[in-house]
Regions:
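Short cysteine clusters
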Residues: 55, 74-77
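Short cysteine/histidine-rich metal-coordination sites, predominantly Zn2+-binding motifs
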Residues: 69-75, 88-97
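Short helix-to-coil "ATP-lid" hinge immediately C-terminal to the conserved N-box Asn in the Bergerat
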Residues: 80
Length: 113
């Protein structure tokens, strides 16, 4: 997921190492950065999910919210998103959150960028 101007060449997407699996225990989330983009990494029952760390309503960082199961709640106006799909579950907005493909190899978590 990269934005490119008409003058930029299209770059291939690749998996970027972002964290050690052991550093993000089940039921928790953390923030990683790829090319200055904040990505929220969530561990739901041992499965990792990545989404943009920004609620579309007032740009609040979702990583400062609350994770319950597969639902992350925005700390500002309590919009709720499914971390597996980025889909809005409930809240004052109608926009979903972009997600990123995740792969785990050994103890390293990779995000497709």
């Amino acid at each position: 997921m990269r934005g490119a101007s008409a003058t930029e060449q299209e770059l291939p997407e690749e998996f970027v190492p972002v964290a050690k699996a052991g550093d993000v225990p089940p039921g928790s989330m953390t923030v990683v950065a790829i090319d200055r983009e904040r990505i929220m990494l969530a561990n739901v029952d041992g499965q990792f999910f990545a989404l943009r760390d920004m609620c579309g309503h007032r740009n609040a960082p979702l990583s400062r919210g609350r994770l319950e199961g597969c639902i992350v709640e925005c700390p500002l106006h309590f919009a709720q998103f499914d971390v597996r799909t980025g889909k809005l579950v409930d809240g004052p907005i109608s926009a979903d959150v972009p997600i990123y493909e995740v792969r785990v190899e050994g103890d390293t978590v990779f995000v497709k960028w």
